Curated annotation (Swiss-Prot):
Its EC number is 3.6.5.-. An essential GTPase which binds GTP, GDP and possibly (p)ppGpp with moderate affinity, with high nucleotide exchange rates and a fairly low GTP hydrolysis rate. Plays a role in control of the cell cycle, stress response, ribosome biogenesis and in those bacteria that undergo differentiation, in morphogenesis control. Residues 1-159 form the Obg domain. Mg(2+) binds at S173, T193. This is GTPase Obg. The keyword Signal does not apply. PROSITE patterns: G_OBG, OBG. Gene3D superfamilies: GTP1/OBG domain, P-loop containing nucleotide triphosphate hydrolases. ATP binds at residues 166-173, 191-195, 213-216, 280-283, 309-311. It is found in: Cytoplasm. The gene is obg. It comes from Synechococcus sp. (strain WH7803).
Length: 329
């Protein structure tokens, strides 16, 4: 299973229609003047944010998007029809960059937001434009211009306020499933989650807050190891991170350090993002082992971890209280 959150496409505006050479042909007007109409303008290519889309999967199978051309002009100064814009739907949270230069062209965040990425060519001029005192029967017209053509890089970043991070198998999918109505695939082996899962958790006010279960990181993720860069970018837009540590892992403290190191190496302000350290799977620990592990995690991170059992539903109210407090809701 592959989460398509990057795509490369080419967009091409429609070509303008040609102007034409024509003359009035009317009864009793033996020498009618020029009447060639202009060509219509080529259609633009427009990207539009759509809240019903979750991935860029559609762009895996189609890479070239060409808008329709304008129609050629007609006699009697009739202008050819201009092309209607080609509207391409993309998920909310899609960044659009010029593939060659890397320049950010736009960030489509809100539903219905639009960005014109290739303008159509202007229509050519008919010979009616070239009538003058010195030339009463011009035979000149111009062709329509080509539309713009650009290679684009699309990147999708999840729009979630809270990101749940941790090494594979830390229990992130279980946590988001019990906190929200999301039902991600859950199994007891690493890398079950290959697609970021979104869930809406209700605040005390009744409003919803979007949580994202970010697939498991591994050492070297910031340099692109595993699924690193593909998923670290999704954390950038979150306001708060829940760092989940598996209490049943061979080295929970080492796991904590791996994730912290990757956040620091990736940059983009992630290491300074407000974060809650949460120790999951308390059902695997006796009292002495729990207290010892909590002390070691606190010594390593400088923060006292919250203790929960996602599978048993324990400690979740206290966790959410901390989340709402840090979000200021």
């Amino acid at each position: 299973m592959q989460f398509i959150d990057q795509a490369r496409i080419t967009v091409r505006g429609g070509r303008g229609g040609d102007g034409i050479v024509a003359f009035r042909r009317e009864k009793y007007v033996p020498a009618g003047g020029p009447s060639g109409g202009d060509g219509g303008h080529g259609a633009d290519v427009v990207l539009e944010a759509d809240s019903n889309l979750q991935t860029l999967l559609d762009f895996k199978y189609k890479r070239l998007f060409a808008a329709i051309d304008g129609r050629r002009g007609g006699p009697n100064r009739c202008t050819g029809a201009s092309g209607q814009p080609l509207v391409i739907k993309v998920p909310c949270g899609t960044e659009v960059r010029h593939l060659t230069t890397g320049i950010l062209l736009g960030d489509l965040t809100n539903p219905g937001e639009r960005l014109t990425v290739a303008f159509g060519g202007r229509g050519g001029l008919g010979n009616a434009h070239y009538l003058s005192n010195r030339n009463r029967a011009p035979e000149k017209c111009t062709e329509g211009r080509d539309g713009e053509e650009w290679p684009l890089q699309l990147e999708l970043k999840l729009l979630a306020e809270v990101g749940i991070i941790g090494l594979p198998n830390a229990g992130k999918s279980t946590l988001i499933s019990v906190l929200s109505a999301a039902r991600p695939k859950i199994a007891d082996y690493p890398f079950t989650t290959l697609v970021p899962n979104l869930g809406v958790v209700r605040r005390p006010s009744g409003d919803g807050t979007v949580f994202a279960d970010i697939p498991g990181l591994i050492a070297g993720a910031a340099q692109g190891a595993g699924l690193g860069h593909d998923f670290l970018r999704h954390i950038e837009r979150t306001r708060l991170l829940i760092h989940l540590v598996d209490s049943g892992a061979d080295d929970p403290v080492g796991d904590l350090r791996v994730v912290e190191k990757e956040l620091e190496a990736y940059g983009h302000g992630l290491v300074s993002r407000p974060r809650l350290l949460v120790l999951n799977k308390l059902e695997l620990l006796d009292e002495q082992g729990r207290d010892d592990l909590l002390e070691r995690l606190e010594a390593s991170s400088g923060h006292r971890p919250l203790l929960i059992s996602a599978v048993m539903g324990k400690g979740l109210d206290a966790l959410l209280d901390q989340v709402w407090q840090l979000l200021g809701v």
